[in-house]
């Protein structure tokens, strides 16, 4: 399947917009065919986009959003309220095994190691009960700029 860069970009934009705005990745049973219908493109085209343009499979794409959702939940202190498995399920993972596998693949660390490191770097969160995702992103941006000076 040959697509122009513009066509591929349009499909990818529609796909990302759908995932972000609808938070479709939270559906543990989300199927590629459902996503294709939702964004108005045929399933075979979506398959080609994953293979040739995004260089990852459908489930890796969806799981990348789920991992980011988990990290956001940790930044909001939700790991203090829920078990690891419950939090993973709330982020769209169907099983503990698939969660651990995906998390390690995208972060290079286990969820437990990530939480320990996060708690070590952000001890104030124990007092405040977490921060919003927006503040978390802002703080990371400031830290990144300081490190590059």
Where are these regions (language model features)?
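Ser/Thr-centric signal marking residues that sit
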Residues: 98, 107
